[in-house]
Regions:
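Metzincin-family zinc-dependent endopeptidase catalytic domain
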Residues: 55, 59, 63-173, 185
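C-terminal motif of bacterial Sec signal peptides marking the signal peptidase cleavage site
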Residues: 16-18
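Metalloprotease/metallohydrolase-associated module, dominated by Zn2+-dependent proteases
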Residues: 143-169, 185-233
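Positively charged n-region of N-terminal signal peptides that target proteins for export
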Residues: 1-4
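Active-site-flanking alpha-helical
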Residues: 179, 183-184
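Sec-dependent N-terminal signal peptides
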Residues: 6-11
Length: 233
C-alpha cells in the first residue's frame, strides 16, 4: 500500500510539473520504457465490464486511457502507465441496484459491490463500466441520472455511457472519477476545459481536456500529504 501511494504521488507530481491544458506532449522521450527497480505492488486502475459492456469495449477504453494518461503524465515511462491499467473479469449488476420506476441503477449500490469484491483492498481502484443509466440522490433530487460516481477518497468508481453524446468522451469521465477516488474534488474555478468541472446534469465533456492550474495544485497537495503520511507509518 505504501509503495503504491508513493508511486501515485510520484506520477501526479510529475504530471503537475510537466503538463499543460494547451499543447500536449507525448513525453517519454529519453526516459525509456523500463520499469522502476522497485515497481509498485498491484495496479492503479482495474476496468470492470458490467452487464452488456463487453470485454472488447473495455480493452478499447484501456488503450485510450493509457494513451491519454501518457499525455497527462508526460514524464512517466510508457511501461509504467501500461502496468497501471488492466481489464478485470466481467460482472453483472445486482438486481437489487435497479430503481424500477425510472429503469436506473443506483450507483451507490454498484460502488458497494465493487468495493466488497476486493475485500477493501485499496491498492486497486476498480472502475465499473456500464451502458445502463445510473443514478444517485444529489442536487436536492431523488434518483438523479449521472454519468459517473466514485468514493472520494476510495477504491471504487462507476461510469456510464448512457448520457454521453460522444462515446469517445468515456475516457474523460473515467479520469474524472479516478481523480475523485484520489481525493480531488470538483473544480471550483470558472474553467470550462478542466476535467474536474461538475457537469451539473449537462453533457459538457466534449469541451474538457486536462486540469486547470488550481486543480493541479490541489492534486499536488493531496498526493504530497499521502506520501508524507505513509512515509511515517
Amino acid at each position: 500500500m505504501k509503495k503504491l501511494l508513493l508511486f501515485i504521488a510520484g506520477i501526479s507530481i510529475l504530471f503537475l510539473a510537466g503538463c499543460s491544458n494547451g499543447n500536449q506532449s507525448h513525453g517519454n522521450e529519453g526516459m525509456g520504457d523500463s520499469l522502476p527497480a522497485d515497481p509498485p505492488l498491484g495496479y492503479v486502475i482495474e476496468l470492470k465490464p458490467l452487464g452488456n459492456f463487453s470485454h472488447q469495449e473495455a480493452e478499447q477504453l484501456r488503450e485510450e486511457l493509457v494513451k491519454q494518461l501518457g499525455f497527462i503524465f508526460n514524464k512517466v515511462p510508457k511501461a509504467w502507465v501500461e502496468a497501471s491499467v488492466f481489464v478485470g473479469d466481467k460482472k453483472e449488476i445486482p438486481a437489487s441496484c435497479l430503481y424500477k420506476p425510472r429503469n436506473r441503477y443506483w450507483a451507490g449500490g454498484i460502488l458497494k459491490m465493487l468495493h466488497e469484491e476486493h475485500g477493501g483492498n485499496d491498492e486497486i481502484v476498480t472502475i465499473g463500466l456500464t451502458h445502463r443509466d445510473i443514478s444517485t440522490s444529489i442536487h436536492g433530487q431523488y434518483n438523479y441520472g449521472i454519468m459517473g460516481l466514485s468514493f472520494r477518497p476510495g477504491d471504487a468508481c462507476v461510469v456510464s455511457t448512457f448520457r454521453l453524446k460522444r462515446k469517445d468522451d468515456l475516457w474523460k469521465v473515467t479520469i474524472h472519477e479516478f481523480l475523485h477516488s484520489r481525493g480531488l474534488p470538483h473544480c471550483k474555478k470558472d474553467a470550462p476545459k478542466c476535467l474536474m468541472q461538475d457537469a451539473h446534469g449537462k453533457n459538457t465533456f466534449y469541451m474538457k481536456h486536462g486540469l486547470c492550474e488550481d486543480c493541479k495544485s490541489s492534486l499536488r497537495m493531496i498526493m504530497t500529504h499521502q506520501e508524507t503520511k505513509y512515509q511515517n507509518t
